Amino acid sequence: LWGDVPLVTESTSIPRTDYTRNAVAEVDGVIDSDLVYAMSNLPVVGAAKNESRINQDMARQLAGEAYLRMGMRDASYFKKAEDAVTPIITGGKYELISARYGKYAAEPGDYYHDMFRWGNQRRSQGNMEAIWTFEMEYNRDVNGGTIDNPQQRRNWVPAFHKLDGMVNADSIGGRGNGRLRISNFVKYGLYEKGDIRNSNYNIRRVMWYNKPGFSKEVGIDAKGFLVDKDKGVRNVTLKTGDQVIPHEGDSLNVFYPHPTKWGAYDETDDFGYAVVKDWPVMRLGETYLLRAEARFRQGNTQGAADDINVLRDRAFKDYRAVAPGAGKVTADQIDIDFILDERARELISEENRRMTLVRTNTLAERIKLNGDVEPAAPSNKVITGFDANIHTLLPIP
């Protein structure tokens, strides 16, 4: 994030103004030492008093990502990255979720979506893919609890409450503000047919009016968008249960395809101030991607393809009933762009994307994908003024 920084390994109680920067390699040496100690001395998963306490596998996952960054400076770290995460994959303590489970198993949905639903996210709740789940306790059950916590739901869930005919509900992710939108690259070009990660349960593209007793006569324009009655090419009566028809301008923050991982609804807080469900920080799906990247960096493209295919076996499992072999990748398809695309497919809205792009030295190129290009014609939303020498590092706080 910052490049060379002052390295402080002992606490101090006296203000100092004479700090000087230490080289990244020197700082990395201390990070490496700390990670090795953590991987050896933290408890194994399930041994801590509380399941949310850190364990060896959390340290291994963190080490894998840190070593991949260090490997861009010293290639010997790529082998260390692979060695760090492999015990998570082979240790028998985790498994990719590939079947319905938990409290919503009888409801419409799919097994990938089950992982991200309130009450399904912890290992004790059946999520054996979870490595580290940051537990968000329901504040009204905690003496002195606060709701001033992460805002992911308000960021990622569109502002459906602005649509006539919609009411806040768990089925639509609660009340959002639509602060973030996935790019057109993700919406229209990232996913292949049959990928469960792009199902309507996971990237919601279609909705239905859910307000009880809703009925309204409206106009529809030549493009199929909602307009006032008698202002379009025809009138229709919309009712509860009909598919939502947006206004043309609603795609800014009211209605657009969005990941559903952060949706949740607390009926005692209809306004939906903050996140009430758990926060997935590390899971086995990313472990395979970290190892695939480490293998690719060592020239083992077949090993990288094997790891990615494990994820794709899960993602295309149902679709392969009608299209055998769908989603399979081969070694000659593997490069860093493919791995970054697969990270987006698997980890959309979960990973810190900027940090991933900075550590892979791809921010300058990949950020261009965010310049919205419509399916038919380019827009004028082009990112300009980017300087990789300046904009990949942050000022020291």
Positions of the model-derived regions?
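Conserved, well-structured interaction surfaces
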Residues: 1-2, 18, 22-29, 35-48, ...
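Extended, hydrophobic/aromatic-rich amphipathic alpha-helical segments that build helical scaffolds
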Residues: 1-9, 24-42, 51-89, 132, ...
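C-terminal substrate/ligand-recognition segments
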Residues: 183-313
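Surface-exposed patches in mature extracellular/periplasmic domains of secreted proteins
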Residues: 44-51, 77, 96-101, 320-324
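Short, mixed-charge aromatic SLiMs
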Residues: 16-19, 87-97, 312-321
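An aromatic- and glycine-enriched ligand-binding surface/loop that stacks and positions planar moieties
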Residues: 68-232
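Long, intrinsically disordered, low-complexity segments
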Residues: 30-32, 105-175, 271-281, 305-308, ...
